[in-house]
């Protein structure tokens, strides 16, 4: 099927922004002012259009293209055309390979156009859906559904247009993934004095306190406390897809999909290395993008945002000083973090030390 491919260029603009025709006025901002609806009808042609892929996937080279294609593919999409006051004018479903459709019989005037793609089968949109429905924390998708190879990664986007009576306008709506991607980068074992590397065995990388659900609109917001992890924790319900077997010599090509998390309640999403030291369990949890950088580091401290990639490079020095809890990081003063802010098609790179 036809896929919508995502490129590097443009912060928070994964697809081409709004394309305007002579009879179409477009704004990237929201206007909550109610307009008087015209009884005259208009038509709108909506298209999802992407750029050539530039993402470097974290998989073996022979599989990289397939994963990239899966992450970028739009299998289906639903277009909602809302009036300025938030009530629904019309909606229409698009299915690959045809990701463009003309919606006729619309009321003239200002519109909000919302597009959702790769919608999980568990989601049902009400017949009388309102624009505010997408911001309701009770209307969410579950992290369990975010599999590029099967369902595709959920995407959403919106724009505003003004339709003229008895004419057809055309617009291309920008969409982006709600999920973010966490990649395990390098692991360097450089033991300090008193920490015997022969007593240390590294076995797994897990994500802990990943948000279990997310709202579908822009922006995606934190939903009621539901957390998943690669192992069970005080906060996290165990999910096998958040755990990867690793060793000190074999840890490349490991990645996870997670939902946005702004550290509400102090519950930042963590990447935790799991192992043993002298036969006893040892955990090395690290908050992801948890603070602004210093001394040349460019981290922004915004934790996890939608449609970003976070690569974490880890240096382990105090092998015998791991945490006893996979959800309790070390004192932040003991961590050195370097983050390079980038979008999904690029990456945020974080270097952490234990």
Question: Where are the model-predicted features located?
Answer:
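Sec-dependent bacterial lipoprotein signal peptides
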Residues: 1-26
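Bacterial Sec-dependent N-terminal signal peptides
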Residues: 21-49, 184, 307, 352
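Structured, solvent-exposed acidic/aromatic patches
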Residues: 59-62, 70-72, 85-87, 107-109, ...
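Tryptophan-paired
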Residues: 63-128, 181-185, 190-306, 348-354
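Short strand-edge motifs at loop-to-beta-strand transitions and within beta-strands
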Residues: 99-101, 169-173, 310
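Structured interaction patches on ligand/partner-binding surfaces of diverse proteins
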Residues: 122-170, 283-296, 305
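C-terminal structured domain segments
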Residues: 281-337
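Protruding loop/beta-arch "assembly-hinge" segments enriched in small, turn-prone residues
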Residues: 333-354
